[in-house]
Curated annotation (Swiss-Prot):
Involved in peptide bond synthesis. Stimulates efficient translation and peptide-bond synthesis on native or reconstituted 70S ribosomes in vitro. Probably functions indirectly by altering the affinity of the ribosome for aminoacyl-tRNA, thus increasing their reactivity as acceptors for peptidyl transferase. It comes from the Bacteria. Belongs to the elongation factor P family. Pathway: Protein biosynthesis; polypeptide chain elongation. It is found in: Cytoplasm. Its main location: cytoplasm. This is Elongation factor P 1. The keyword Repeat does not apply. The lineage of its organism: Bacteria, Bacillati, Bacillota, Bacilli, Lactobacillales. InterPro entries: Elong-fact-P_C, NA-bd_OB-fold, Rib_uL2_dom2, Transl_elong_fac_P/YeiP, Transl_elong_KOW-like, Transl_elong_P/YeiP_cen, Transl_elong_P/YeiP_CS, Transl_elongation_fac_P.
Length: 191
């Protein structure tokens, strides 16, 4: 048993006979009243996402999860195929199980796959960032800075990201998988 205040993104717990995956977990302190945990949760089986508020002291049963490294290969319709990087076994995961993570799946990306004790796939955990190419955006503005208002850019997977005004089509960018936000140009050296 673990208290709700200790729940973090990616954790899986059991509630009312269902496996629930934490998509987001935020501490919230309203002006009046006690602190609450506001969470986005996904039913592992159905893929349904709900927003739930819990008291920090509420307890839930964590589910033991086995992680295996796997490489994304391809998709056919709503089924996505991954290959275990150690055993070369292939696994299919439904679009419902993946949810919004689909927008970050690039060919050959390596993810962690989550399995229950009875070897059922629960879902995947993405790396913290991915590199993607800008497929469509307005032309870049010369002399623009990162501090500008930004503009929307459609990435090669269909993900829409707010990027600085100086970004052009065809550029490779580093995108955070937590919020889908622009981090930097790929291959740029930190200053």
């Amino acid at each position: 048993m673990v208290q709700a205040i200790n729940l973090k993104k990616g954790m899986i717990f059991s509630q009312d006979g269902k496996l629930i995956k934490v998509l987001k977990a935020n501490h919230h302190k309203p002006g009046k009243g006690n602190t609450v945990m506001q969470m986005d949760l996904r039913d592992v089986k159905s893929g349904a996402v709900v927003h739930k508020t819990m008291r920090p002291t509420e307890k839930v049963d964590l589910v033991e999860v086995t992680k295996k490294s796997a490489q994304y290969l391809y998709n056919e319709g709503d089924n996505y195929t991954f290959m275990d990087t150690d055993t070369y076994d292939q696994y299919e995961v439904s679009a419902d199980q993946l949810g919004d993570d689909i927008k970050f799946l690039m060919p050959n990306i390596v993810v962690d796959m989550d399995f229950t004790d009875d070897n059922k796939i629960i879902g995947i955990e993405l790396p913290s960032t991915v590199e993607m190419t800008v497929k469509e955006t307005q032309p870049g503005i010369k002399g623009a800075t990162v501090a500008g208002g930004g503009k929307p850019a459609t990435m090669e997977t269909g993900l829409v990201v707010q990027v600085p005004d100086f970004i052009n089509e065809g550029e490779k960018l580093v995108i955070g998988t937590e919020n889908g936000d622009y981090k930097s140009r790929a291959n740029s050296q930190p200053r």
